[in-house]
């Protein structure tokens, strides 16, 4: 097995501060104003779908849009469930490669059948998706060699947070850099512990972080992993908790008064709890079995969540290497999925 720094996935994870800074340094205004549309749909597959959900959350909260993230395949096979003919509607189509079949087809249906305006978002000029949209947003700086999406996710998400009027996203690169230096060794140590199951939890913006964290672990390790909204997990899914379970809770300051109760409840059911968050109550941090705690001078939870994604990416990488997997080329996966 190669050394850690010989994997392109590792290089792309630790390059995130520089990639994000480079993207933010050259951003201009969005080519279209989402607030001028009655309906805004965002679509993609895999990580691009979770990226869409993250952006929809931020736009609804900070711009007042009526945005919804929908899998590309749903728009292809069930368009009338989502498209509303007659609305002034906008579709943002996300695909890292620009060659994901479902996403390109969804964009074409939106234009040809629904009369929507389409923004194509990808990393490759001249790709299939790049040629379809009325507007194009290109991120060639974060073209990735690895099958799994890491720095491209962070950089594109950061750009859209900036376009959500969250200027503080410009503060993230040095904060992420500092965290990588401080926490990498502990993340690697955590990856050596054998847990029977891993569940990521988060609320608000952190729910989208939990989903992307879950996908990174599934992709790189091939192991079953779950993601839920923090409080929804208590309504049925908590039945799976037992000794040998790890609950990785991304704590949201907006529901900080209930974090201690959540942690205690999961521990009472036999699970270990790792809590990660910014400016969280000391009682919650002390109650958890382990924690990654930050004291960042940030105002918005959407920015905080993006700043913590690298922790889950690193965990997935180190866990995969520990299991003898190749995180650059995970089993059963390809870089581009075509239908």
What are these regions (language model features)?
Residues 36-177, 183-184, 203, 238, ...:
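Glycine-rich phosphate-binding loops that contact phosphosugars or nucleotide phosphates
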